[in-house]
Amino acid sequence: MNPLFGPNLFLLQQEQQGLAGPLGDPLGGDHFAGGGDLASAPLASAGPSAYSPPGPGPAPPAAMALRNDLGSNINVLKTLNLRFRCFLAKVHELERRNRLLEKQLQQALEEGKQGRRGLARRDQAVQTGFISPIRPLGLPLSSRPAAVCPPSARVLGSPSRSPAGPLASSAACHTSSSTSTSTAFSSSTRFMPGTIWSFSHARRLGPGLEPTLVQGPGLSWVHPDGVGVQIDTITPEIRALYNVLAKVKRERDEYKRRWEEEYTVRIQLQERVTELQEEAQEADACQEELAMKVEQLKAELVVFKGLMSNNLTELDTKIQEKAMKVDMDICRRIDITAKLCDLAQQRNCEDMIQMFQKKLVPSMGGRKRERKAAVEEDTSLSESDGPRQPEGAEEESTALSINEEMQRMLSQLREYDFEDDCDSLTWEETEETLLLWEDFSGYAMAAAEAQGEQEDSLEKVIKDTESLFKTREKEYQETIDQIELELATAKNDMNRHLHEYMEMCSMKRGLDVQMETCRRLITQSGDRKSPAFTAVPLSDPPPPPSETEDSDRDVSSDSSMR
């Protein structure tokens, strides 16, 4: 393999020239008119830039990795493709210059008959002067004019690397030309990669000294080893190779596209995984904060339950005590009112009995008449001058007895054992009226079980407990309002009863006065009409109660009521 035609040659061509053209662009005849130097456009047009993958910049690392992963076979096929294209370009160029080369070779043979032999001609290498557009960095591309050296010298001027030494004519040509031009020509043609070395094949066909140059018909040239190369058309092998290379290129592009898609998906997945990891860390931090808050809420709930239980217990105790006091007060006052009414009625009956059950006996002697006259005189004197001292003492004793009786009745009422189930105000200790903390036991157990099973329902339990407390507090408030309303109603009833009792007492005093007046009138009229009847008992009956006694009794009863 010729090291001058490596794969890097065409990569450098693509980077430096940046030209793209169809394969096998023919060279015009005007490039070689007048024996001028060759242009660099044919090889550039026949270069691999037309088949190189598009892209303004160098291949990305992903493409390089994909290219390395596809294996060495693709690289080998690519290298062969590039070398075949270069070879075909050179063959086309040689075909176009075939006739010119024949003339130049004929002239060279005629000029060098005497100094050279067939063996030397056989081994002589002739450089065609084809200058490739690819040049090493730092070496300028020289466009040598046609008048500098004749065509024979350009054809026969062999480089230093040729098997044979330089000819005389070539040396003369080089001496006739300028030093700078010769140096530029040698530096640009001898060492430029891509220059074509052709070997002229001269064989002795006869015993003579003159060798005979065997030249082909123009479509082929004869290799020194006798191998003929067909250059007029592309062989099926090369076409098949092109097809294989195109298929490999398509597969490579498909693999590249798939790899880029997978690479993009992989990058997206990595970014998504990173985001999920960050979210997981944030979720862990939030979970720790929520756990701390749950612990704090548990502690606050315990304290809250303790405070609420204490407050509710105190409230229940106060409600029960107030209800019992209300019941006791109402029952006591109603019973006192009933007792006082009974006492007043009994007193009225006793007064009437004492008034109408006086037993009169007829007087048998003058002493009885004198006593009766003395009594009448005393009565008339008492009506005119006021009561005397014995009658005042009797009235005081009667008032004291009445006061003692009232004190005894009040002491009995105070000592009376009131039962709790009295229904004076229809107060009953039922589930609707009596509310204790024991009613919350079921809710507390349910809340404890819910906390043990599911911690996430703690907030719900707190809300339910608060709503339950609010509901119970509202019920307590309604119960208290109802009790206060009933208490106010009872107070109004008691005041009304007190006013009625006071009216009854005033009516009773008026009736007592009238009854006393009637009794005295009846007594006086009876004494006048039936003087024969006298009283049976020896002791004088107690005088009837006067208005002062009635007033004292009313005042004592009013004070007891208050």
UniProtKB/Swiss-Prot annotation:
Region annotation Disordered: where it falls in the sequence: 154-187, 364-401, 523-562
Q: Which residue numbers delimit the IF rod domain? A: 73-529
Q: Which domain of life is it from?
A: Eukaryota
| Low complexity composition-biased segments | 168-187
**GO CC list:** intermediate filament; nuclear inner membrane; nuclear matrix; nucleoplasm
Q: What is its main location?
A: nucleus
* Coiled coil residues, start to end: 85-117, 237-301, 458-504
Q: What are the record keywords, sorted?
A: Coiled coil, Intermediate filament, Membrane, Nucleus
Subcellular localization(s) per the UniProt record: Nucleus; Nucleus, Nucleoplasm; Nucleus inner membrane; Nucleus matrix
* Region span, XCCR4 binding. Required for localization to the double-strand breaks (DSBs): 453-528
Spell out the Basic and acidic residues composition-biased ranges: 553-562
**Where do the record's region annotations for LMNA binding lie?**
65-116
A Gene Ontology biological process annotation?
double-strand break repair via nonhomologous end joining
Question: What's its job?
Answer: Nuclear matrix protein involved in the immobilization of broken DNA ends and the suppression of chromosome translocation during DNA double-strand breaks (DSBs). Interacts with the nuclear lamina component LMNA, resulting in the formation of a nucleoskeleton that will relocalize to the DSB sites in a XRCC4-dependent manner and promote the immobilization of the broken ends, thereby preventing chromosome translocation. Acts as a scaffold that allows the DNA repair protein XRCC4 and LMNA to assemble into a complex at the DSB sites.
What does the sequence similarity comment in the record state about its family? Belongs to the intermediate filament family.
Q: How does it assemble?
A: Forms a heterotetramer with XRCC4. The interaction with XRCC4 is direct, involves LIG4-free XRCC4 and leads to relocalization of IFFO1 at the double-strand break (DSB) sites. Interacts with LMNA; the interaction forms an interior nucleoskeleton and the recruitment to DNA double-strand breaks.
Could you identify this protein by its name? Non-homologous end joining factor IFFO1
Q: Which organism is it from?
A: Mus musculus
